[in-house]
């Protein structure tokens, strides 16, 4: 997520939000599916990542952002879904996100939700953040500690559609990479004192 006070205008058009209901990942062909029974799914393994017992966990230090683009799969048109679980206990301000239209760790788009009931869309370009949609309230987000939320991005051509728990949020027109792109996960810890852990239960990609 964009983590600076100043916001930079992004030359993309965001269409009006809707309340259309839609099932997750409706494509006919499953391109990728990971329920995290092992760590062989092509994710970047480092000290901030823990994959075991059917979960993908991002360990988040205070005031930390962790992103993880899948290394071994490249897609074009794709429907991406993931289940994110807020940690139990006293909540810190936390964000969970899907990455799409990714080239590398310096260039990708991010769709995320906060455990305060807001969502955002941002772009990282040449290592710099640009906010597209900034922290919009959305009642479909489950905010309770331990609650699960399903995030979905359906990217077709130059249009991406965003869903939270089956409810369509909005569309976005942009410029995807020309020769395929990568997808991934992200976690944001906005507490400046407490560390935490964000868990994802699955990732599925269809076309």
Language-model regions: role of each:
Residues 1-9:
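Bacterial N-terminal signal peptides that target proteins for export
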Residues 25-45:
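Extracellular carbohydrate-recognition regions
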Residues 36, 80-82, 146-156, 160-162:
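Short tryptophan-centered beta-strand motifs in secreted/extracellular beta-sheet-rich domains
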Residues 36, 201-205:
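Extracellular beta-strand elements of beta-rich domains used
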Residues 48-66:
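Short carbohydrate-recognition loop motifs
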Residues 61-125:
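Secretory/extracellular carbohydrate-interaction modules
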Residues 127-150:
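Short, aromatic/His-centered strand-loop micro-motif at the edge of beta-sheets
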Residues 172-199:
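Flexible glycan-contacting loops in extracellular carbohydrate-active proteins
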